[in-house]
């Protein structure tokens, strides 16, 4: 199990540190505020705030923010998801005080000057248009909007250019004052970090003291509005592109649903990253119909999403759809054999082990799990859960989620 330590400051900030011998420290603030926390009239504001948070604080100019870590070889980055916004750095251990000072400053003391916003809006809109020009990326957002139609989970993270151009300093302050609070965030650090020094630095920068050291008794997941009933649909959109893009899927399981692990394994068998994934073998290796075919799943606190994506020549859409249907029917009708199940478990455990060797991704994953769900990433326990999955559980998931009449389809032609 990965060694970690936790604490809470008087202002409610949660702290988690993972120990490793690496001289590089990955650290940052993970804030419980993403696209799903936006109001319907402010879609795109979370991502907008992520951009303009770098444009100056009460004691640093935008150029100061850029130079602070770069002049010692460090890296400063950020990203927005449906459920959170993350500001983080990669820095040599000796520069940790500098990183904590900068990260705390931009997260809690940014001023969002309108002059800087006016320039950055053009950058954001260029990002949006670039995304709109990439149907293989755009289709994921539009599909999620179909699955969660009318719900904040269906919000497009980037938003629309016409709305983003109207955002002001006042809008940024309104959103961040509501969500960018110490008691709505977690600070994570992964590296060769002295925990007592880490607490001292964070207490100093936050102007507060340590309340608790040890296990944290609750997570910070915010309840989202109740989902409306799911209604599968098929939508075709003429994109005037040479290649067709197709997504097929269904609502799936929430994070704490016991069926989620069976879907996790089934999804990897069906369309995971391996070339031996069933869909890759059927559509690409045997017939050469696609370059990319994959299946994905995501779980939120109260629901989830499972989907398949492929891109092919427009004249091959029907054949590819039939092949996908045949693979789904196979899982519905036949349980995995013992040898198939054993190989599938070995494969996914190997993938997990290799992924955990990426310290940056592990730090971000650990922070997210701890922020929303109170998870402590225990690889041994995860392997035990995988080993406990049965062929019958996998078949039951397929029989629930893969039924043709329950699938939503989005096709760009």
Task: For every predicted segment, state its role.
Residues 1-25:
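N- or domain-start disorder-to-order transition segments that initiate the globular core
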Residues 16, 26-30, 53, 77-79, ...:
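Short, conserved beta-strand segments within well-ordered enzyme catalytic domains
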């Amino acid at each position: 199990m990965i060694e970690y330590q936790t604490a809470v400051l008087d202002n409610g900030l949660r702290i988690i540190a993972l120990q490793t011998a690496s001289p590089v420290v990955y650290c940052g603030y993970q804030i419980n505020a993403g696209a799903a926390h936006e109001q319907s009239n402010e879609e795109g504001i979370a991502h907008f705030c992520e951009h303009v948070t770098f444009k100056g604080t009460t004691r640093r100019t935008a150029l100061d923010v850029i130079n602070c870590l770069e002049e010692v070889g460090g890296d400063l980055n950020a990203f927005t998801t449906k459920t959170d916004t993350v500001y983080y750095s990669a820095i040599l251990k000796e520069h940790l005080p500098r990183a904590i000072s900068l990260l705390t400053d931009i997260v809690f003391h940014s001023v969002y000057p309108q002059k800087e916003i006016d320039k950055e809006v053009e950058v954001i809109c260029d990002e949006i248009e670039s995304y709109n020009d990439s149907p293989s990326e755009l289709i994921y957002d539009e599909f999620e909007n179909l699955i969660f139609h009318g719900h904040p989970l269906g919000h497009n993270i980037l938003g629309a250019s016409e709305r983003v151009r109207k955002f002001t300093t006042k809008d940024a302050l309104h959103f961040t004052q509501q969500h960018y609070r110490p008691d709505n965030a977690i600070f994570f650090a992964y590296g060769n970090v002295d925990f007592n020094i880490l607490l001292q630095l964070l207490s100093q920068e936050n102007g507060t003291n340590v309340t608790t050291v040890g296990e944290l008794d609750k997570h910070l997941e915010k309840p989202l509005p109740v989902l409306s009933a799911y209604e599968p649909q098929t939508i075709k959109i003429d994109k005037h592109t040479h290649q067709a893009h197709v997504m097929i899927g269904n609502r799936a399981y929430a994070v704490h649903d016991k069926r989620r692990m069976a879907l996790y394994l089934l999804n990897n068998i069906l369309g995971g990253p391996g070339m031996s994934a069933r869909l890759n073998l059927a559509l690409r290796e045997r017939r050469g119909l696609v370059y990319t075919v994959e299946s994905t799943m995501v779980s939120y606190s109260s629901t989830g999403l499972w989907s398949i994506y492929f891109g092919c020549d427009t004249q091959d859409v029907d054949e590819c759809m039939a092949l996908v249907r045949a693979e789904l029917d196979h899982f519905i009708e036949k349980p995995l054999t013992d040898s198939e199940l054993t190989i599938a478990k070995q494969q996914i455990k190997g993938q997990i082990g290799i992924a955990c060797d990426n310290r940056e991704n592990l730090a971000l994953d650990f922070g997210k799990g701890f922020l929303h769900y109170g998870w402590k990433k225990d690889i041994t326990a995860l392997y035990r859960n995988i080993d406990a999955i049965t062929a019958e559980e996998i078949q039951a998931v397929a029989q629930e989620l893969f039924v043709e009449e329950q699938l939503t389809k989005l096709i760009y032609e």
